[in-house]
Amino acid sequence: MLGLLGGVGGVGLLTLAGCGGADRPGAAARTPGSAPPGPATTATTGTTATTTAISAADCAPFPTETGGPFPADGTNGPNVLNQAGVVRTDLRESFAGLRGTATGSPLAVRLRVLDLDAGCTPRRGIAVYAWHCDGDGRYSLYSAGATDQNWCRGVQVTDGDGTVAFTTVFPGAYPGRYPHLHFEVYASAASAAGGPKLLTSQLAFPE
């Protein structure tokens, strides 16, 4: 369980499934070397999504993992979290005055935040910041040829079902890494602009 500040104790982010584009398998997993994946709560293929109930017995905290060297959260250079337009569903385009589109196959991602201290009930109003490389393995704001872009980055706030959804592109693999997506969890959209992180972790998509 997470030790969270401000009375938001016991928030767990579960593995969600499926993240599937038109030509991608619909499965998500923890990064190599971490604990085995927990039960999938959401399956997404193309534009169709199904949700499976999670029992309290199956509910488990998500492991903390590195945010990597390209977070653009102000800890290593640029910070998109204080820019207008960062709260968005579609991550494929750059925003805040930048123009550009990420390369890669379409990908739909759904994440669900559950309260472990309340019988694994959904948490409304939690902010999730997600980022990843494009289909060519480039990180916006950091990689050569992409320093003037901020695609594949954005924040969503959980709905009444504890869910956030992103439309993006399938991240490319690069030496030593499976395709993967990083995320940070904050108590609210306002706290994402400088407040404490409740969780930093990532999902891997073995091809």
What residue spans do the PLM features occupy?
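N-terminal export signals
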Residues: 1-20
